[in-house]
Amino acid sequence: MRAPASSAASNRPGPSNHPTPRWNSKQFFLTYPHCNLTPSELMKELFSRLTEKIPGYIKVSQEFHKDGDPHLHVLIQLNTKLCTRNPKFFDVQGFHPNIQPVRDAEKVFGYISKTNGDSDEMGELQLRIKKPEKPTRDQRMAMIIASSTNRNEYLSMVRKEFPFDWAIRLQQFEYSAAALFTEPPPVYQSPFPNEQIVCPPELVDIIDQEWNQQPNGPRRPRSIYICGPSRTGKTTWARNIGRHNYYNSTVDFTHYDKDAIYNVIDDVPFKFLPQWKALVGAQRDYIVNPKYGKKKKIPGGIPSIILTNDDEDWIKDMKPAQVEYLHANAHVHYMYEGQKFYVLPAEE
C-alpha cells in the first residue's frame, strides 16, 4: 500500500505570484532612503549606467529629515525608453531606490526642487507642452453671444458651431436672438397725408388731456374703444398717433416695445384676449406667457385703442361686470353711419 504524500511537501511554497515589476518609460522618479551619497556622486553613477539610453536630463536633490537622515530624490529623463525587469537596475553602491515612472515631469521637478539639501543636475529639462483645454459648450455659447453684433450674425455663428442643435432648436435660438438684439419696430407709414386724417373731437380730448398731459403719471389713462365698419380709416388713424405696439387678430407679447406710448388692438375677438383688463385698464407690471417663450413681466401703464367691426363687438360677448369695467376704463365710441377717419381731397 502506497504511503500518503507528506503533508510537509504539500505546504512547500510555490513560485511567487508577484512577478518582477517591468519598467518601460522615458522618465523616472527615484527616491533613495537613508542614502549618504552626495547628489554629484549619485548623478555620475546613474549617468554612467544610462549612457546607452542617452540621458536628456538628470536632477538629484538631497533632503534631510528632522532626525538628520538623508534621502536623495532623482528625476531622470531619457531620449529612448528604458525597458527592464531588473529590480536592482538603479541600485547604486548597495542603495536601492523606490522607482516610479513619471507622467508629469513638471510636478516631480517642482517637488524635488523644494528639498533642504544640496542638489546637482545635468542636461536640459523637457516639459510636456500641455494642449489647451477645449472650451465647454457653455463657454462656446458665451463667446458667440459676446462676439456677435446682430441677429443674423448670431444665428449664423450658432449654426456653424452647433449644427445639430440649430436644426432641432432653431425656434429657441431665434427667440434668444430677438432678446439679445432688440430691433426697434419699423415706423408706421400712413397711406394718407396727415391733413387727410380726421378724428372725432371727443377722442382728441382724451388723447390731449389724458395721454399727453400725464405720461406715466399716478392716474391710469383711459383707453379708447371704437366699433364700426371696415375700410373707414380707423386703423390708419390709430396707428398714426405715435409709437405703439400693434396687434392684429391675436396678441403676442414676444416683441413688446417698452418704449411704445400706447397699444393698438385691431380685430382681436374678445374671447381670445385673456389679458384684456390689463390692456384696457393701462395696468402696470402684469405677467404674460408669450407663444414659444418664457413668462415675462410687461411694464404696461399705457392705454390701448381697441378697434372692432360690428360683428365682433366686444360688448356683445361681455358679462355685465365686464361691460362696466370697459366703460370705467375706456371711452366707448360707436361709429355713426358714413363716418370715416379720413377725408379725400375731393370731399374737402
Curated annotation (Swiss-Prot):
Keyword terms of this UniProt record: ATP-binding, Covalent protein-DNA linkage, DNA replication, DNA-binding, Endonuclease, Helicase, Host nucleus, Hydrolase, Metal-binding, Multifunctional enzyme, Nuclease, Nucleotide-binding, Nucleotidyltransferase, Repressor, Transferase
Motif (RCR-2): 71-73
GO MF term list: ATP binding; DNA binding; endodeoxyribonuclease activity, producing 5'-phosphomonoesters; helicase activity; metal ion binding; nucleotidyltransferase activity; structural molecule activity
Active-site residues, Swiss-Prot/TrEMBL: 111
Domain CRESS-DNA virus Rep endonuclease: start-end pairs: 22-125
InterPro entries in the record: CRESS_DNA_REP, Gemini_AL1_CLV, Gemini_AL1_REP, Gemini_AL1_REP_central, P-loop_NTPase
Domain of life of the organism encoding this protein: Viruses
Binding site for ATP: 228-235
EC number assigned by the record: 2.7.7.-, 3.1.21.-
Similarity remark: Belongs to the geminiviridae Rep protein family.
Protein name per UniProt: Replication-associated protein
Species annotation: Miscanthus streak virus (isolate 91)
